[in-house]
């Protein structure tokens, strides 16, 4: 995972798929607008670091096809699953494959219909038998903030619906407990910072780029309340909105 994180070119994901307001992500995954956000190392391509992580994992040489191999001559390869019904996700997967294979990691693309995709990537739809090796995931605003927040439901292997990353690590679970037990914003922020540090160290999931949501409203009104899930059209807006 660490080798992959350094082998990808995030500038290209931002420019090919992002808007004019997109930016390169950090290793802590969650963007700066998130409650409890902590600055972590920016993601950027570093092929020397990626190669060193490959060597540390026992893949120091390449075969005639340009793929890293271990001492037994087995090439480094994994299957990348994506939802064929989401055109952008297929594009992400294709660019990941192109970049990683240029680096020396073989990627087999597995494009599935929505039901088959869910059955390989979700605890609920796989009956707690997730079988994918890696996947292009779509995150919702609600999912990012659900339960303990910071996309943790997608990482936590014990989550009854999501849990795609299948993480059961004790340190990770202890951090989630601290977030859930926080009684003040300060306590939550401290625990959230620990989770982002954990993400950065272990890279269970990798953000390809960060982008912005642009909300349009009538110029005749101001003091809208912005909600991450419902945008401007949310209950709190009706208590804050004023006419100019």
Q: Can you say where each PLM-predicted feature lies in the sequence?
A:
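Feature representing long, continuous alpha-helical segments
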Residues: 94, 98, 134-137, 144, ...
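Bilobed periplasmic-binding protein-like "clamshell/Venus-flytrap" ligand-binding domains
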Residues: 15-17, 57-83, 128-135, 182-218
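Periplasmic binding protein-like
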Residues: 101-155
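Short, solvent-exposed loop/beta-turn-alpha elements that line the ligand-binding surface or hinge
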Residues: 35-52, 62-76, 122-130, 148-181, ...
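Short, flexible loop/turn elements at secondary-structure junctions
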Residues: 8, 34, 82-84, 111-114, ...
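Conserved structured core elements
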Residues: 7, 11, 24, 44, ...
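Append "and occasionally in soluble cytosolic enzymes with long acidic Gly/Pro-rich linkers
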Residues: 1-98, 194, 243
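Sec-exported extracytoplasmic/periplasmic mature domains
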Residues: 5-23, 35, 55-60, 98-105, ...
């Amino acid at each position: 995972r660490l080798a992959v994180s350094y082998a990808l070119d995030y500038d290209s994901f931002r420019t090919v798929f992002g808007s004019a307001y997109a930016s390169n992500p950090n290793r802590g995954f969650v963007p700066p607008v998130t409650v409890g956000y902590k600055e972590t190392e920016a993601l950027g391509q570093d092929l020397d670091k990626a190669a060193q992580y490959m060597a540390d994992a026992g893949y120091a040489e390449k075969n005639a096809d340009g793929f890293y191999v271990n001492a037994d001559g087995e090439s480094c390869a994994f299957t990348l699953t994506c939802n064929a019904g989401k055109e952008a996700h297929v594009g992400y997967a294709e660019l990941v494959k192109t970049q990683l294979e240029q680096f020396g990691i073989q990627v087999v693309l597995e494009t599935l219909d929505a039901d088959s995709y869910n059955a390989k990537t979700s605890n609920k739809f796989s009956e707690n038998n997730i079988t994918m090796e890696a996947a292009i995931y779509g995150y919702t605003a609600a999912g990012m903030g659900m339960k303990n927040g910071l996309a943790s439901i997608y990482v936590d292997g014990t989550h009854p619906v999501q849990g795609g990353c299948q993480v059961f690590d004790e340190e990770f679970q202890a951090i989630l407990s601290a977030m859930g037990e926080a009684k003040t914003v300060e306590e939550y922020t401290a625990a959230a910072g620990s989770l982002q540090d954990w993400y950065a160290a272990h890279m269970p999931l990798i953000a390809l780029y960060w982008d912005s949501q642009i909300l349009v409203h009538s110029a005749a009104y101001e003091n809208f309340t912005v909600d991450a899930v419902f945008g401007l059209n949310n209950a709190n807006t009706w208590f804050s909105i004023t006419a100019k």
